[in-house]
Amino acid sequence: GNTVNGKIYAVPVAANVASSQNFAFNGPLLEKYGIDVSNVKDYASLEPVLKAIKEKDPNVVPFAMNKSYGGPSDDFDYVAVDGLPFVVDLKGDTTKIVDRYTIPRYVENLKTLHKYYEAGYIPKDVATSDTGYDLSQDTWLVREETVGPADYGNSLLSRVANRKIEIKPFTELFPHIQLAYTTPHRRQHRYTR
């Protein structure tokens, strides 16, 4: 099934072969309230930023997320789907599959997010909410986004939002599987780079 007259026809996917997790900040709100994000590098270092926006504008959600949030991002390669805890720890032994809940830095990030929830930086209805925090609105200050080199850093998110979005990576770039679509049956074949 994947050949026509003995030849394989495929359309490569022009996409990122690597990506990182980033905090995406609402640029107009950073400027309006004079909030500095230059020291943000992980979940723990977000606290002064979240506190500042909560004090300056209580109508803005400091850390936007809803019920689809799968937990803190980290340098993990998921061996199944994101909802399962089985990962390869890219900062640890990459020859083993482990439960992410046994990795101390992941547990610390969970504790940090819980602290933010209790402080009101994360929406109280996060577990049941379908609220989508539109990139183009001033309803949120920070959210998590996956960004790769083909996204040109801030520029793709800024173009989509039609406003400045400032990103701060908090994981390394890591390679991932891309798909090639072949004809005539549109089967998906996985390959890695």
Language model segments and positions:
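Extracytoplasmic/secretory soluble proteins
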Residues: G1-R193
